[in-house]
Amino acid sequence: MAEKENTKRNRREEILQALAQMLESSDGSQRITTAKLAANVGVSEAALYRHFPSKTRMFDSLIEFIEDTLTSRINLILQDEKDTFHRLRLILLLILGFAERNPGLTRIMTGHALMFEQDRLQGRINQLFERIEAQLRQVLKERRLREGSGFDHDETLLASQLLAFCEGMLSRFVRSEFRYRPTQEFETRWPLLACQLQ
């Protein structure tokens, strides 16, 4: 029984990895059909539906992976780091680095892969970025408590500026067919971003 469950889980993971790889390839700029995905995995469409009730559920699983990975690592940063600027830098670097290591998933994060899918999938991505923006805002607000001084500008504006930088770098990565890495020149860009926060 346990062996059958492992085989099923492995097949699910294989399907999700194939979908992510297709999103990374030139197929990712077009609608990915279950027929194409089944051919890529080497199974029938019926076999896909034994593991996932719909293609939407496959995208849900990939979005869940993105959410879990980013949220858990942001929480670790907040737990381990106390300096505001260091926290912000690490959170941005986390988002950019995750995207760089997972180009196919970046198409989901930017919404490109979701254009032909159900609207609620884009809603989930929107909520993820809203939660990240809220965490950035909280880090900025906590500076006054932690370090005794706040910022000259509204924390909401600053948080949205930081997130807009990340989203812009992810869009550039997708638009360039993954040539321009999101972390490229980050160490040069970060001081410019940090200056805007002063």
Swiss-Prot record:
Main location: cytoplasm
GO MF term list: DNA-binding transcription factor activity; transcription cis-regulatory region binding
GO biological process terms held by the UniProt record: cell division; negative regulation of division septum assembly
A Pfam family the protein falls into: SlmA-like_C
Record keywords, A-Z: Cell cycle, Cell division, Coiled coil, Cytoplasm, DNA-binding
HAMAP family with a match to the protein in the record: NO_factor_SlmA (MF_01839)
Purpose of the protein: Required for nucleoid occlusion (NO) phenomenon, which prevents Z-ring formation and cell division over the nucleoid. Acts as a DNA-associated cell division inhibitor that binds simultaneously chromosomal DNA and FtsZ, and disrupts the assembly of FtsZ polymers. SlmA-DNA-binding sequences (SBS) are dispersed on non-Ter regions of the chromosome, preventing FtsZ polymerization at these regions.
Name listed for the protein in its UniProt record: Nucleoid occlusion factor SlmA
